[in-house]
Structure formats: structure tokens, C-alpha cells
Amino acid sequence: MAENSFKNVTIQSKPFFLSQAKTLFLLGGVFSAFFILMVGLVFFDYANSMDNAIFNFARSTPFNSSPILTLILQNITRLGSSQFVLPLSLLVGVFLSLYRRNLALGVWFVLSVVLFEALLESLKHLLAHSIQWFSHSANFPNATALSLALFYGLLILLIPHLITHQTLKNILFYSLFGLIFLIGLALIVLGVSLSSVLGGFCLGALGACFSIGIYLSVFQKI
């Protein structure tokens, strides 16, 4: 009887994590579709008028007329740069490996940030050189938006698995979402085109979704 119960729990737990992995792969596919859509809009210059309208509106804000506010925005955007994200990912990897005693997850987290960022950066440069012949938006997708969506996206996806306290979970969840939105808004105000920011977000988000999805498919738990 107990043996049958144990078998039932084992059989039920595996599809649970597999369904989570499938959900993440599906979500990554949605971000991939949005990225392809943004590539098409930029490639055929449909995003140019939208970017110019947002750029002109951003220039009319008081942030561009104040050197202090501009400096604050630049410091905010550094929270999503690869120079900030890569060392921080090492700290998160050490935390997951030692404090949470999950070496596989810690190593996977660091490798995900490093490898996905390198892969997506290569794709970014390839697209930038291709689009440069057809569009004025040569900075597509934005590297900072890519880095912050990848790193903070991984943290957002790990929060439900690592933290059980619901209030703390909600605070961290919405704080990270707010930080992503704030850094993206700061990039736009500083003159980065909206299409470049959205393209970077989509690339980073699909990288985070596929990374955790692959991890769940391989290890079946976090």
C-alpha cells in the first residue's frame, strides 16, 4: 500500500516539473515570436516613426535638461549592463551552490548568464550588421536590455522555487519587475530607441525561459 502511494507520488511529481518546463518553453516561444516581429518592424523601417515619436517625447522631458538627472539615469542603466550583471551572477551562483547546497543550479545559473549572453550578443551583432544596410536602427537589439532581461528574468523564474514565504516572494517578484521596467524606461529617456529596448527584452526573456526550462527537463527539480 505504502509502496503504491510512493509510486503514485513519483509518477505525479515528474509530470508536474515537465509541465512547468513545457510552460517555460511555450513562454520562450512567445518571446521568440515577439522578437521576430520586432526584427520585421525594424528591418522594413516600420518601427522608425514610432521610435522617432518616443525619442522626441523623451527629449522634451526635464531629464534631458538636467545633468544631475541624466547622471542618475545613467547610473540606473548600469544596473542592467553586462559589467554589473556578470559579477553579480557569480555571487548568485555561489549563493545557490553553498547556502542552498545546490551546486548544479549554481553552476547552471552562471553558465546560463555567460553562455546565453555570449550567444545572444553574437546574434545581436549579426542582426545589427544585417539591419544596418536597411534601417537607421543599427543598435538593435540593445545590449543592456538583453542583459537585464536575462539575469533578472532568471531570478524571477527561480523565486517561486527558492522562497516559500508568500509576502517575501511577492515583494521580490514585483521589485524585480519594477527594476526591469525602470531600467528600460531610463534607457528610452536617454535616447535608446523603443524597438531596440523591446528587442533586447525579448531576447533576454527567451534566454531565461529556455534556460530554466532546460534545467527542469534535465534535473526535474530546483
What is each of the regions a protein language model found here?
Residues 2-82, 125-132:
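N-terminal transmembrane-helix/juxtamembrane module of multi-pass inner/ER membrane proteins
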Residues 25-27, 104-112, 171-176, 196-200:
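Alpha-helical transmembrane segments of integral membrane proteins
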Residues 26-41, 89-95, 178-183:
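Hydrophobic core of alpha-helical transmembrane segments in multi-pass integral membrane proteins
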Residues 36, 114-122, 178-188:
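Aromatic-anchored segments of alpha-helical transmembrane domains
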Residues 75-86, 139-148:
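Structural signature of hydrophobic alpha-helical transmembrane segments
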Residues 89-116:
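Interfacial segments of alpha-helical transmembrane regions
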Residues 108-112, 116, 120, 200, ...:
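Alpha-helical transmembrane segments in multi-pass membrane proteins
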Residues 131-222:
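Membrane-embedded catalytic cores of phosphoryl/pyrophosphoryl-handling enzymes
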